[in-house]
Amino acid sequence: MTPHINAKIGDFHPQCILCGDPLRVSYIAKNFLQDAREITNVRNMLGFSGKYKGKEISLMGHGMGIASCTIYVTELVKTYQVKELLRIGTCGAISPKVGLRDIIMVTGASTDSKTNRIRFLNHDLSATPDFELSLRAYQTAKRLEIDLKVGNIFTSDFFYSFETHAFDLLAKYNHLGIEMEAAGLYATAMELSAKALCLCSVSDHLITKEALSPKERIESFNNMIILALEMMG
């Protein structure tokens, strides 16, 4: 047990899928897993363990932003010996290379947060995913005939007040979208010798102002859930 997770030791399996929204975690458990059981609920940040096609797998919410995400990642790895962490979330696109419903495999995460600089003695940390997980995601997407987009993401500490004039600069440097956790996830996994990867479904486009309806978001997210479960299974 930790300050934020009340699961018993052994409740979490070595492979864990992460979502910012605990209700998405519950949705996946109820609609995609067999023998799913709730194993933690501190602060209503839900976690489940179950099976997908006979393979044991766990699910965990992590909240919004680097600070919240890294708390849960640290406790999952250090206390519960989780070895592989796959975050599936949404992002806002800033590049013409991607559109609504596209799934992005995040190969690198820049950030306006100081957390990684503090962690890395004020140097620039290359926040990147595990190669094996990335390869599995790419190969699984090919098998499922999912057109997986590959590129960098910008992880921001801001949801409402990010500098919109920077969108063109980010796109120039092959940043496909903006979200709030990947840079922290990757850095924490690197520090703790765990494997991590982030997949993001494009829910809105910050340049064209297009956005999915709530129903369309669910349908789009389902494709990413299946990709995640298939590659981790």
Curated annotation (Swiss-Prot):
HAMAP family linked to this entry: Pur_nucleosid_phosp
Pfam families xrefs: PNP_UDP_1
The EC number(s) this enzyme carries: 2.4.2.1
Key words, A-Z: Glycosyltransferase, Transferase
Protein name in the entry: Purine nucleoside phosphorylase DeoD-type
Active-site annotation: D204
Binding site for phosphate: G20, R24, R43, R87, I88, G89, T90
Record has Glycosyltransferase as a keyword: yes
PROSITE patterns, per database record: PNP_UDP_1 (PS01232)
GO CC, alphabetical: cytosol
PANTHER family in UniProt: FI09636P-RELATED (PTHR43691:SF11), URIDINE PHOSPHORYLASE (PTHR43691)
Positions contributing to a purine D-ribonucleoside binding: H4, E179, M180, E181, S203, D204
Domain of life: Bacteria
Catalyzed chemical reaction(s): a purine D-ribonucleoside + phosphate = a purine nucleobase + alpha-D-ribose 1-phosphate; a purine 2'-deoxy-D-ribonucleoside + phosphate = a purine nucleobase + 2-deoxy-alpha-D-ribose 1-phosphate
Protein family per UniProt: Belongs to the PNP/UDP phosphorylase family.
Record gene name: deoD
Gene source species: Helicobacter acinonychis (strain Sheeba)
Site entry: Important for catalytic activity: R217
Gene3D superfamilies linked to this entry: Nucleoside phosphorylase domain
One GO BP: purine nucleoside catabolic process
Subunit and interaction comment: Homohexamer; trimer of homodimers.
One of the record's GO molecular function terms: purine-nucleoside phosphorylase activity
Signal peptide: none
Function recorded in the entry: Catalyzes the reversible phosphorolytic breakdown of the N-glycosidic bond in the beta-(deoxy)ribonucleoside molecules, with the formation of the corresponding free purine bases and pentose-1-phosphate.
Keyword S-adenosyl-L-methionine: no
